[in-house]
Swiss-Prot record:
It catalyses: ATP + H2O = ADP + phosphate + H(+). Component of the mcm2-7 complex (RLF-M). The complex forms a toroidal hexameric ring with the proposed subunit order mcm2-mcm6-mcm4-mcm7-mcm3-mcm5. Component of the CMG helicase complex, composed of the mcm2-7 complex, the GINS complex and cdc45. This is Zygotic DNA replication licensing factor mcm3. InterPro entries: AAA+_ATPase, MCM, Mcm3, MCM_CS, MCM_dom, MCM_lid, MCM_N, MCM_OB.
Length: 809
């Protein structure tokens, strides 16, 4: 008699939980959030509702705690309540699907874990696990209900199937029926049977959160129905689901050790880049800094890169250009021109190569470290592995795929075998990994920059051999590196004295608050235990420090005038500068073309200069990428002559270990000397007009690569003046885009200023902005007009648009 009483009590608790969940969903009298979400779900033909745990916790804390700690019963009751609620809104839609599903998001507290901290205390609980997807199985159909017809008896048999990956408490028999009780054969009615999609993925803990010197942990995850194919290898995800153990059998007996899986109910893609939080004050400081240091901003930023390393100024400039990158172009015919910059450092031991790599790991938004001995070719690109349980082939992502849109730092590059080095050729130029193995044909994105460090062939650099003999790498690989620097350990008493003074000051420096004998922690990152960042407002309130506080012991007495930028300011400045996509001007393009031909002929002009890497057509793209990166440092919309000159200087130093002297401009052969003298005295604009006029008279065809005069001119940035009342006035720009008249632009600016005033904020979301400017407006603005006007104002540095949020500068 005890068992039926327990069952009746459990059913009563289940009905009570279902009623409370139904009250939570039916919030029409409150705010109507979830009622509108359910209606949107029905209109989009979906069957999974995403519920924020924080909302449930506010309304019914007891029920939220029971759901978190007893996931199976809680989710079953929640899903039944959702089906009842959908039936009350739309009865016909509720009959279309067998089940409706609940997905969770919000703050999970101590249940927000990584694969390493996923322990037995989390069993049968709702957990949120974050990591990188390393393996993905194929999507297979899984039978939920089978229908069988018996021709002899004219009867139909129906059977449901559940296993330990389902929410039901007891799994059903896995035997597929072929005969009925009287041994009559059965025919499967596939049209009436129900199947669901089933996929298994493996996520691994993130490299920045894994402890040093230990193997990264991983966990298997079950994805069903609409969650399959949401992720691919290399994606950073947060998976919310139920943690469950499965018995493992050996020789027909169940062993005492269990394997664990996570049954997912929601998958959230994490951002590809770690985007810092910007406030209006931060943007104002960045803009002010770029204007006040417009002449020496490249020197200032490169000097602040790795300030603990003495010297190597050109290498720091190259690393700054690598962090910013060029502009990636994908042409209409499918050709991709990469914008990533690859750098190779070759030199004697103890010249701070590995320290530079380590600084990039701390500064870059995403960086994956590897070493030459500890990495294979498939470990860097991708591998096809076999699943131990099912025997299926799986695709496993390598380090370069995991570092998509980031930086891969390869130390001890010379210790890799030639076969492994050949595997990264495609990644360095095409930005993707193509796999054709074991019946799997796949293409994975690996758009990453490569920063590699290596030693010469003989351990130390031999001055009596050519650079190519010392490097010992094949030309096909060297040409894929944009810059190759040779770092020598030269014996110079003055330089040795400066380095020793610098290193000794570093060792004597002690951070504020450091106690005797205590080591400061390596990282001070705070883990956010929620699916969305709750500390955005508190981070915005912290004031951004532009410069580090001068310390005579750390920075030296002589360098008091040389201010060092703070790491946080550098990170935010690089992130803002990467948004710009500068365009080449005719002047810069001509200069790059001339210097490229000069570099190609340098071996014939001077035999005493030995180059470090071959000058190929890729060198021309290198010059364009470096010029674009230098223009990004200045936050310019166009690549000017000074950007091209800085790029040429970097390339010359990398190729010839010194900056070559500038040649005098050769006179044009096809022009008369008198005409040339007259042209040099005239302004550039008149000379161009005369050249165009001469072409028109001679009847030449139009040159498709001719740049317009507007691209040669540097755009004038208008600084908004601050009036007496404290509000910023936006000047009217006369240059309106096609389809947007000057009057409409003026009306838009006044409406935009009114929207910022009424919101009392420095930033407005795009949807709220559209609603505000078209409110009480007789002639509302269209989406195209708003986009064109915002582009004009962004070019004039009045506003900044990022992630569909408009910032007033």
């Amino acid at each position: 008699m005890a068992a039926p009483a327990v069952t009746e009590l459990e059913d009563q608790e289940m009905r009570e939980a279902q009623r409370e969940y139904l009250d939570f969903l039916d919030d029409e009298e409150d705010q109507g959030i979830y009622q509108s979400k359910v209606r949107d779900m029905i209109s989009e033909n979906q069957y999974r509702l995403i519920v924020n745990v924080n909302d449930l916790r506010k309304k019914n804390e007891k029920r939220a705690n029971m759901l978190m700690n007893n996931a199976f019963e809680g989710l079953i009751a929640f899903q039944r309540a959702l089906k009842d609620f959908v039936a009350s809104i739309d009865g016909t839609y509720a009959k279309q699907y067998e089940e409706f599903y609940i997905g969770l998001e919000g703050s999970f507290g101590n249940k927000h874990v990584t694969p390493r901290t996923l322990t037995s205390r989390c069993l049968s609980c709702i957990v949120c696990v974050e990591g990188i997807v390393t393996k993905c199985s194929l999507v297979r159909p899984k039978v939920v209900r089978s229908v069988h017809y018996c021709p002899a008896t004219k009867k139909t048999i129906e059977r449901k199937y559940t296993d330990l990956t389902s929410l039901e408490a007891f799994p059903s028999s896995a035997v597929y029926p072929t005969k009925d009780e009287e041994n009559n054969p059965l025919e499967t009615e596939y049209g009436l049977s129900i199947y669901k999609d089933h996929q298994t993925i493996t996520i691994q803990e993130m490299p920045e959160k894994a402890p040093a010197g230990q193997l990264p942990r991983s966990v298997d995850i079950i994805l069903d129905d609409d969650l399959v194919d949401k992720v691919k290898p290399g994606d950073r995800v947060q998976v919310i689901g139920t943690y469950r153990c499965l018995p493992s059998k050996q020789n027909g007996y169940t062993s005492a050790s269990f394997r664990t899986i996570l049954i997912a109910c929601n998958v959230i893609q994490m951002s590809k880049e770690v985007t810092p939080v910007f406030s209006a004050d931060d943007l104002a400081k960045i803009k002010k800094f770029s204007k006040s240091h417009s002449k020496d901003i490249f020197e200032q930023l490169s000097r602040s890169l790795a300030p603990s390393i003495h010297g190597h100024l050109y290498i720091k400039k190259a690393i700054l250009c690598m962090l910013l990158g060029g502009v990636e172009k994908v042409l209409d015919n499918g050709t991709r021109i990469r914008g990533d910059i690859n750098v190779l450092l070759i030199g004697d031991p103890s010249v701070a190569k590995s320290q530079l790599l380590r600084y990039v790991l701390c500064t870059a938004p995403r960086a994956i470290p590897t070493t030459g001995r500890g990495s294979s070719g498939v470990g860097l690109t991708a591998a096809v592995t076999t699943d131990q349980e099912t025997g299926e082939r799986r695709l496993e992502a390598g380090a370069m795929v995991l570092a998509d849109r980031g930086v891969v730092c390869i130390d001890e590059f010379d210790k890799m075998s030639d076969m492994d080095r050949t595997a990264i050729h495609e990644v360095m130029e095409q930005g993707r990994v193509t796999i054709a193995k074991a019946g799997i044909h796949a293409r994975l994105n690996a758009r990453c920059s490569v920063l590699a460090a290596a030693n010469p062939v003989y351990g130390r650099y031999d001055q009596y051999k050519t650079p190519m003999d010392n490097i010992g790498l094949q030309d096909s690989l060297l040409s894929r590196f944009d810059l190759l620097f040779i770092m020598l350990d030269q014996m110079d008493p003055e330089q040795d004295r400066e380095i020793s003074d610098h290193v000794l000051r570093m060792h004597r420096y002690r951070a504020a608050g450091e106690q005797d004998g205590d080591a400061m922690p390596l990282g001070s990152a705070v883990d956010i235990l929620a699916t969305n960042d709750p500390n955005v407002t508190s981070e915005e309130q912290q004031e951004l420090q532009v410069y580090e506080k001068h310390d005579s012991l750390l920075h030296g007495v002589k360098k008091r005038k040389e201010k060092i930028l703070s790491v946080e300011f550098m990170r935010k400045y690089v992130h803002v500068a990467k948004i710009f996509k500068p365009v080449l001007t005719q002047e810069a393009a001509s200069f790059i073309a001339e210097e490229y031909s000069r570099l190609r002929n340098q071996d014939q002009l001077s035999t005493d200069v030995a180059r470090t890497s071959p000058v190929t057509a890729r060198t021309l793209e290198t010059l364009i990428r470096l010029s674009t990166a230098h223009a990004k440092v200045r936050m310019s919309k166009t690549v000017q002559l000074q950007d091209a000159e800085a790029a040429i200087e970097l390339v010359q130093y990398a190729y010839f270990k010194k900056v070559l002297e500038k040649e005098k401009k050769r006179r044009r052969r096809d022009e008369d000397s008198d005409t040339e003298g007259e042209q040099q005295t005239q302004p550039d604009g008149e000379a161009k007009k005369r050249r165009k006029k001469r072409r028109a008279q001679e009847g030449e065809s139009h040159d498709p690569y001719e740049f317009s005069d507007t691209e040669d001119e540097t755009p004038v940035v208008h600084t908004p003046k601050t009036p007496v009342n404290g509000q910023e006035e936006m000047e009217t720009d006369s240059s309106a885009k096609p389809g947007l008249s000057g009057e409409r632009l003026k009306a838009f600016k006044s409406a935009l200023l009114g929207a910022f005033k009424s919101a009392h904020a420095q930033s407005i979301a795009m949807e709220a902005l559209m609603e505000a400017i078209n409110k009480r407006n007789d002639s509302p603005f269209s989406q195209a007009e708003v986009k064109a006007a915002l582009e004009l104002m962004e070019e004039a540095n009045h506003i900044m648009v990022s992630d569909n949020i408009v910032f007033l500068i």
